[in-house]
Swiss-Prot record:
This is Putative RING-H2 finger protein ATL19. Pathway: Protein modification; protein ubiquitination. It comes from Arabidopsis thaliana (Mouse-ear cress). GO terms for molecular function: transferase activity; zinc ion binding. PANTHER family: RING FINGER DOMAIN-CONTAINING, RING-H2 FINGER PROTEIN ATL19-RELATED. Its main location: membrane. The RING-type zinc finger domain mediates binding to an E2 ubiquitin-conjugating enzyme. It catalyses: S-ubiquitinyl-[E2 ubiquitin-conjugating enzyme]-L-cysteine + [acceptor protein]-L-lysine = [E2 ubiquitin-conjugating enzyme]-L-cysteine + N(6)-ubiquitinyl-[acceptor protein]-L-lysine.
Amino acid sequence: MSSEEDDAISLISVLGLAVFIGLCILLVVLIATSALILVIYVIIDCILRPFLGTCLDLDLEIGVQRGQQRARIVTYHTIISTGLRLPDFEREGKKRGLKQSVIETLLPKLLVGQGNHEEDEEKSLESRECAICLSGYVVNEECRVFPVCRHIYHALCIDAWLKNHLTCPTCRKDLPES
């Protein structure tokens, strides 16, 4: 081999090594950037989102205040009122539920925020939302308190529930037999 050939091979080797090192550096930068983006996403999603959501009283998924979520509730009540139900083959032959007159007797309606039921008011302040429809309570809204466990629900929600079940939706305690 001549010295020109050695120089050409040496130049090609150096250029190949430089390209290889450049690609390795680019790959490391790409991996580090991806890791940084992932860390930022986790911080925002797991740490800041719940904090900002409760402090600003915003639902970050749809960008509205919680009091403006009536569309979801109307849809839920529409589904209940139309009677759409999935078949329950275990109870097909035996009807377990209460008539509206029995529900009215066992669980009288109460208005939220009236102060005439202090213990119930404390429960509603603890939960701040109906466990059935997941909507918050509004002042002067009709609610019912489950007599056994004192859980509070919207009247329409618990009425629909009690027409098919004889237990509390939250803790599954049975209604008193009377």
